[in-house]
Amino acid sequence: MARTKQTARKSTGGKAPRKQLATKAARKSAPAAGGVKKPHRYKPGTVALREIRRYQKSTELLIRKLPFQRLVREIAQDFKTDLRFQSSAIGALQEAAEAYLVSLFEDTNLAAIHAKRVTIQPKDIALARRLRGERS
């Protein structure tokens, strides 16, 4: 028997497609029939960059005042009970805390970029604190 060249053909065998559930079929056909428009979505990263620009321009405090005040009072309880705070003292603490956090995140971002990443990780924060000479 002579050898013949084989050509690729589409397969007709295999499993038959399963029937869709009624709800899935209804869901697929509904948007086409009703013409419901999908909400607009920005590309990933666009909104993040917009927020970065917005917060770099602003000078207002980003942590809410009352939760920060509760945290300060809770931490102060460990050292001495019945402490009282002037509102300006809590405001100064909040300003200092936010300035520290912003600075730490800047250094953390530099550490992530140095590692050829764009996402910060806990090890970046640890490295930034270590380079600053802070205890971790």
UniProtKB/Swiss-Prot annotation:
Which Gene3D superfamilies does the protein's record reference?
Answer: Histone, subunit A (1.10.20.10)
Matches recorded under InterPro entries = Histone-fold, Histone_H2A/H2B/H3, Histone_H3/CENP-A
- Give the GO molecular function terms: DNA binding; protein heterodimerization activity; structural constituent of chromatin
Q: Does the keyword Coiled coil apply?
A: no
Phosphoserine modification, residue list:
11
Record CDD domains: HFD_H3 (cd22911)
PROSITE patterns in alphabetical order: HISTONE_H3_1 (PS00322), HISTONE_H3_2 (PS00959)
Location of N6,N6-dimethyllysine modifications: 5, 15, 28, 37, 80
Q: Which residues carry this modification: N6-methyllysine?
A: 5, 10, 19, 24, 28, 37, 80
Question: Where does the record place the modification N6-acetyllysine?
Answer: 10, 15, 19, 24, 28, 37, 57, 65
Biased composition of type Low complexity is found at 22-33
Subcellular location(s): the record lists:
Nucleus; Chromosome
Modification after translation: Phosphorylated to form H3S10ph. H3S10ph promotes subsequent H3K14ac formation and is required for transcriptional activation through TBP recruitment to the promoters.
Gene Ontology cellular-component terms for this entry are: nucleosome; nucleus
- Region annotation Disordered: where it falls in the sequence: 1-41
- N6,N6,N6-trimethyllysine-modified residues are 5, 28, 37, 80
Q: Which keywords belong to this entry?
A: Acetylation, Chromosome, DNA-binding, Methylation, Nucleosome core, Nucleus, Phosphoprotein
Physiological role: Core component of nucleosome. Nucleosomes wrap and compact DNA into chromatin, limiting DNA accessibility to the cellular machineries which require DNA as a template. Histones thereby play a central role in transcription regulation, DNA repair, DNA replication and chromosomal stability. DNA accessibility is regulated via a complex set of post-translational modifications of histones, also called histone code, and nucleosome remodeling.
Q: How does it assemble?
A: The nucleosome is a histone octamer containing two molecules each of H2A, H2B, H3 and H4 assembled in one H3-H4 heterotetramer and two H2A-H2B heterodimers. The octamer wraps approximately 147 bp of DNA.
- Tell me its family: Belongs to the histone H3 family.
UniProt name for this protein: Histone H3.1
Organism expressing this protein natively: Mycosarcoma maydis
